[in-house]
Amino acid sequence: MKDAKPFPVLKNDNLLRAARGEVVDRVPVWVMRQAGRYLPEFQELRKHHDFFTVCRTPELACEVTMQPLRRFDLDASIIFSDILVIPQALGLTVEMHAGVGPVLPQPIVVPEDLKRLTPDGALSRLSYVGDAITMMRHKLEGRVPLIGFTGAPWTLMGYMIEGGGSKTMSKAKAWLNEHPEDSKLFLNLLTDAIVDYLEMQVKAGAQMLQVFESSAEHLSKEQFLQWCVPYLKRIRDELVDRLTKKAIPVVPMTLFAKGAGHSLKEQSELGYDVIGLDWTVDPLEARNLVGPNITLQGNLDPQDMYRDPDELRNLTTEMVHKFGKSRYIANLGHGITPQTPITSMEVLVEAVHKAL
């Protein structure tokens, strides 16, 4: 895991300062999926390597993580990986199909199928992520902080039951109604694996963590509070407890629950330093709901990246003015999409930095 060589000193810590509510030189900006298909060099690398081969090969994962930093003046890097590495480590096959996305050919269909999962040894099967994080910290040479991440329990459960992405999550939602006790068992099993995984990432050198509850959008507020919030709280509490007991510095944590703008106040009470917002949430309303002691991240509509540069510049500037310079990390309200023009990233990053 973490090698003996000390990590380079961090030169640009605006991301971490913003997360902690400290004064920043400039509003930090990074973009979800900033290492990805909109970059021609990523497409080129993918011609030669399968998606999960890139994830599992630290040198390749680092190369892809570095690609956006060579082009843009970003304030953070995020290790190249995928939320579905946890289902893989738990024994499920995950394949990436062109034009379709992730496919899990043997999904969890009935509660009996939970016996197929292999939590013992799951963490050791994820060691390649830790290796990539440690390698990346050295390759960054202190330029910007490195973010680690995970999928959240409900989101992972959804993929594992649906057998891939879903527009409705109907099978997974049916589980919550028809098998409530087994659903709790499933979510707790995933929570245990996630806490182990995040602890490993911090030990390997991750300087910040993001928890992606991307499928929160399929749940009502009542369901979100029942089936997401207790597990999201447990992730934060148990990780902090473990790191503290081992005298490892606690890194800032971001919760991004897409589509859960209805529960921002509740999210702000879970102990996370940063709350990520999707583009449907008004920045001023969000600030009123979470109060002054939480950092907000977001939330430009990824579709706005297809506008002409002047429009994009104006929208970005307006967004930053709404959030303000304190306790704010600029980002999109979801991942950047594959056909996004490169120039839009240049405009976004420059506009954020010049806005205030």
Swiss-Prot record:
UniProt binding sites for coproporphyrinogen I: 33, 35, 37, 46, 82, 159, 214, 334
GO biological process, alphabetically ordered: heme biosynthetic process; protoporphyrinogen IX biosynthetic process
UniProt keyword Cytoplasm, yes or no: yes
The protein's annotated pathway: Porphyrin-containing compound metabolism; protoporphyrin-IX biosynthesis; coproporphyrinogen-III from 5-aminolevulinate: step 4/4
First-listed, main subcellular location of the protein, grouped into a coarse class: cytoplasm
GO cellular component: cytosol
EC number(s) per entry: 4.1.1.37
InterPro entries per the UniProt record, alphabetical: UROD/MetE-like_sf, Uroporphyrinogen_deCO2ase_HemE, Uroporphyrinogen_deCOase
The reaction(s) this protein catalyses: uroporphyrinogen III + 4 H(+) = coproporphyrinogen III + 4 CO2
Binding site for coproporphyrinogen III: 33, 35, 37, 82, 159, 214, 334
Site (Transition state stabilizer): 82
Gene3D superfamilies tied to this protein: 3.20.20.210
A GO molecular function held by the record: uroporphyrinogen decarboxylase activity
Xref: SUPFAM superfamilies: UROD/MetE-like
Disulfide bonds: none
Subcellular location: Cytoplasm, Cytosol
Keyword Cytoplasm attached: yes
Keywords assigned by UniProt, alphabetized: Cytoplasm, Decarboxylase, Heme biosynthesis, Lyase, Porphyrin biosynthesis
Cross-referenced PROSITE patterns: UROD_1 (PS00906), UROD_2 (PS00907)
Pfam family, one: URO-D
EC class: lyase
Oligomeric and partner information: Homodimer.
Family to which this protein belongs: Belongs to the uroporphyrinogen decarboxylase family.
Its biological purpose: Catalyzes the decarboxylation of four acetate groups of uroporphyrinogen-III to yield coproporphyrinogen-III.
Name the UniProt record assigns to this protein: Uroporphyrinogen decarboxylase
Organism this protein belongs to: Drosophila melanogaster (Fruit fly)
